[in-house]
Design a protein with these regions (language model features):
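ATP-dependent carboxylate/acyl-activation modules
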Residues: 1-217
């Protein structure tokens, strides 16, 4: 596997990942203690990455037949607020924190993207499916299996779902409700948004519309 962090890789972190089979670890810096631990692992590559703001690229390059597509990277996002709530039920303070986390994570997942989170942890990821309900099914199933391994029932955990694009129909909300999802954040903007809002209201699920999508192809 591959691990990447955005801060110094410490000896404590090195000890935590040592039992795991990894091929690459990326970090801005590795401490001396971390190097002592990690250099004992065979076939492990350590990459120091310059994460300075002035070193970051602002463009994305994709090869196409007969040419090259250059587009701006999606580097912006929005801070969530209760004013974005489109449902009768409003999210709790704890749910707002998890919704902001889900919105931040789903931005980096290949579209169509769905994430399921709780208490600042990603429990399920659905990526790259042809339709959004398919990605939702994958993310929900992953979350269910992750929690089941801990002896927990997904329907009792009050999880939060995030989507990088709008729900074209109400089916994704219905699927979320079947798994006990307690709050949803999505861009909104579908001509059938009302179907998703109606489904969320029927199940007592607070839902935010951010007004901004995060497609990653």
């Amino acid at each position: 596997g591959i691990v990447g962090v955005n801060r110094e890789f410490t000896a404590e972190l090195a000890a935590a990942v040592k039992p795991i089979f990894l091929e690459i670890i990326m970090a801005p810096k590795f401490s001396e203690g971390a190097l002592e631990v990690l250099c004992t692992k065979k076939n492990l590559r350590l990459l120091e990455v310059d994460m300075s703001a002035d070193k970051k690229s602002h463009n994305q390059y994709v090869s196409v037949n007969g040419g090259l597509l250059v587009q701006q990277l999606d580097t912006t996002t929005v801070a969530l607020s209760e004013d974005m709530c489109v449902t009768e039920k409003k999210p709790s303070a704890e749910q707002m924190i998890d919704m902001q986390f889900a919105w931040r994570i789903v931005k980096h997942v290949k579209s169509n993207a769905i994430v399921v989170v709780k208490d600042g942890k990603t429990l399920g990821v659905g990526a790259g499916q042809m339709n959004r309900v398919g990605s939702a099914a994958i993310a929900l199933k992953q979350a269910e299996e992750t929690l089941a391994a801990e002896g927990k029932d997904i329907r009792k955990e009050g999880l939060v779902m995030g989507s990088d694009g709008f729900f074209p129909f109400g089916d994704s909300v219905e699927s979320a409700a079947q798994f006990g999802i307690a709050a949803i954040v999505q861009p909104g903007g579908s001509v059938r948004d009302e179907e998703s809002i109606t489904a969320a209201n029927a199940h007592g699920i607070p839902m935010l519309f951010t007004g901004m999508r995060h497609f990653k192809h």
